[in-house]
């Protein structure tokens, strides 16, 4: 599997990097950590080309270099990568420019597969979308944003599962809230949820929510299948059938001490644009991490 962790700053991206690497370890996934900076001007791009053989002299995006330096130090400190015994510093001259707006360095992983550090410049949605397509990414991990449209566009336009790291504290005692129904992505979400629960030793609440007064048979069958799968996987769990508004029930159940896992909406892109989707609304409303599985 391949994970992409998007980081923006040393001050705000620690929870994203922390949780992202822990989940990647659970999946034994290859990981790319990407910083997306502002678009470089045509003049700056030509300067980058002249300096591509020695990126120590590249001052075009010093913030990006500093953020990758911080990520590198985190990886070394937590033993996610094998550091250079002669020099534990982040060596920028190892960065290789692959495009006008992209450079990278690949490191040998210890608890995951290969770890890549990537710097891109340009529109964040387009850059992350291109990186996901380029690397065949399975899960993109991002921090929560106050810009509602940004999360909406990431969920709609990026062709991978999306893990939104919101209000995460590594010392908090979490449970896992798993949304179960008869939608196409539910079985994949259940399998992802099991991997996360195993890695973090989480109790799982597999919840099926109906906004009508009756549970249709397909919902009941999905709940039974989830119960069987969790039991066979050896996961400590409970299965619940609940009547009520989906967003409200998820919010009241999750609070701030759950990690939510749910399948992506099957609505058309046009319908999502005008009306939104349940996963998007849950990720906005609930004050906890949420994994939306595609």
Describe the role of every protein-language-model region.
Residues 58-62, 69, 87:
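Functional cleft and adjacent loop/helix regions within the main domain
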Residues 73-140, 231-270, 288:
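Structural beta-alpha unit
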Residues 34-36, 120-122, 165, 207-209, ...:
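Conserved beta-strand termini and adjacent loop/short-helix elements that scaffold enzyme active sites
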Residues 1-61, 76, 83, 174-240:
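Small/aliphatic-rich secondary-structure junction motif
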Residues 20, 71, 128, 193, ...:
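Aromatic/hydrophobic pocket-lining residues that form π-stacking "cages" and hydrophobic walls in ligand
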Residues 105-109, 165-172:
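Short boundary motifs at domain starts and secondary-structure transition points
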Residues 11-13, 17-19, 117-170, 254-294:
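Gly/Ser-rich helix-loop-strand patches that form or flank binding pockets
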Residues 63-71, 94-102, 192, 218-226:
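Short, solvent-exposed amphipathic alpha-helices that sit
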